[in-house]
Design a protein with these regions (language model features):
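Buried hydrophobic core signal strongest for RNase H-like alpha/beta domains in large
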Residues: 1-456
Length: 456
């Protein structure tokens, strides 16, 4: 259910253009450059802010969110025999939804990466059906858990050598096997937990160094990072936070707070990570580009609605990604329909799910109040891992700024040889010709919008 104040728009009638003033393709492409001022400013501000949060023990606390309303969820009957594996399946799903909501002018349709890929191409192939007639289809990227996972996955691939060394040194070779080199969605929760304790440890280690003589201020992040690069091991620690871990944390927190335009800045930042050969996020890079297209190209009143609905107010405590409700439903079906499994039993379960889930959410509201409401009460204690990793960094890199910044190009952390992640990003983002950032952006966005949109 959408609050009335978000429904006052006039651009979504059949035959009426849902787009605003034409975008400049050059200006659009420039948003993804490594030097883009908005992206750089956010990274630098975030670095300082997150180190200060680490200092006061609030780094992993959920944002304090004012949720204006709680979404009312209606769960439709399951669509049997279709997935996202083919365009025909996704088109059938769209048609079922359009038929059930033919009195609507707009359908914002969420999904995981594969669903969004299919929808983007269906809009390209059949604009007369999905854009020029109602209900208009606007794809909404599922940003938590899927978006968070893929942002993490791209950076994890770049920093896997550091992660491996940190896990082995902190946990011991046998226990460290739980921290995998190539995470999948199935092990997302355990791997992001590992990322969080490494993030805390690296943050607290940099804070320790910053309080010793000669250290630059953390309020000057560019100078701070440049000094860290004198020692390759300290550079690994600093860039792990600056380019990767803080991006993942920032992304997750912004979805929780429904800060839509800030999420767009983070997708633009992700481009530099996902576009590298090591990260190889060949599906999520084009999807990130299209996410920004929809955020920028819509008519102002429709864009206002789009940004307000970026994340779903699932409870009084927090917003979630558009992919979260269906993930919860899938998990509930798996747990709740264990015996005599049949189509009829699953349909009955889905029909009753809203009441069960609403009751569960109400219980969580109570528990959140009892535990103080910062979200960390649900997380396994990580203090021993954090302390052990900090000890490793102190022993191998140095206990003060002067020691840690002695020029050194040979790792003492046991990190395997290879191109440094931050160097690979710079090289990837400075390619000439057809592989340049502007050419890549233009190629993707023009191809996927050529039947219904024209850039300046």
């Amino acid at each position: 259910m959408i609050p009335y104040h978000l429904m006052l728009f006039s651009c979504a009638f059949a035959g009426k253009n849902p787009f605003g003033p034409r975008l400049s393709i050059a200006e659009f492409a420039s948003k993804f450059l490594l030097s883009n001022q908005e992206v750089v400013a956010n990274k630098q501000k975030r670095f300082t802010a997150y180190l200060k949060k680490a200092a006061d023990g609030t780094l992993l606390h959920r944002p304090d969110v004012n949720v204006p309303y709680v979404a009312h969820m209606t769960y439709h009957k399951p669509m049997w025999g279709v997935l996202q594996s083919s365009y025909a399946d996704v088109e059938k799903e769209l048609e079922v939804m359009r038929e059930q909501h033919k009195d609507k002018r707009i359908l914002f349709v969420g999904g995981d990466g594969l669903s969004i890929i299919r929808m983007n191409h269906l809009l390209l192939q059949r604009p007369e059906r999905y854009i020029d007639s109602t209900p208009l289809i606007i794809p909404v990227q599922g940003e938590a858990p899927h978006g968070v996972f893929h942002v993490m996955h791209g950076g994890w691939r770049l920093y896997s050598r550091f992660i491996r060394a940190a896990a082995d040194a902190t946990l011991g070779i046998e226990l460290a096997k739980a921290v995998v080199d190539e995470p999948t969605v199935k092990v997302f929760n355990t791997q992001i937990y590992a990322l969080w304790w490494m993030t805390r440890a690296c943050s607290e280690y940099l804070l320790l160094l910053s309080r010793t003589p000669g250290a630059p201020s953390i309020d000057q992040p560019a100078e701070f990072i440049a000094e860290c690069e004198k020692n390759v091991d300290l550079a690994w620690v600093a860039h792990f936070l600056y380019d990767f871990a803080y991006l993942v944390l920032n992304f997750k927190q912004e979805v929780r707070a429904n800060r839509s335009k800030h999420i767009d800045v983070l997708w633009r930042e992700f481009f530099s990570v996902g576009n590298t050969g090591t990260a190889n996020k060949t599906n999520y890079v084009p999807m990130a580009i299209m996410r920004i297209f929809w955020a920028d190209a819509l008519a102002p009143d429709l864009a206002h609605l789009y940004h307000n609905l970026r994340a779903i107010p699932m409870s009084k405590r927090v917003f979630v990604g558009w992919d979260t409700p269906i993930e919860w439903l899938n998990g509930a079906i798996t747990d709740g329909v264990r015996q005599l499994v049949s189509d009829a039993r699953i349909e009955e379960f889905v029909a009753n799910y809203y009441l069960m889930n609403h009751s569960y959410a109400s219980l969580l509201d109570v528990l959140e109040v009892l535990h103080g409401g910062n979200g960390t009460s649900h997380m396994k204690d990580m203090s021993s891992n954090v302390d052990e990793m900090k000890k490793w960094l102190v022993d191998k890199v140095g206990k003060d700024w002067a020691t840690a910044t002695v020029r050194n190009s040979s790792t003492k952390l046991g990190i395997k040889r290879g191109v440094l992640p931050w160097v690979e990003v710079r090289e990837s983002m400075s390619q000439p010709g057809a592989d340049s950032v502007p050419a890549t952006i233009c190629r993707h966005v023009r191809h996927l919008t050529k039947t219904f949109y024209a850039f300046r």
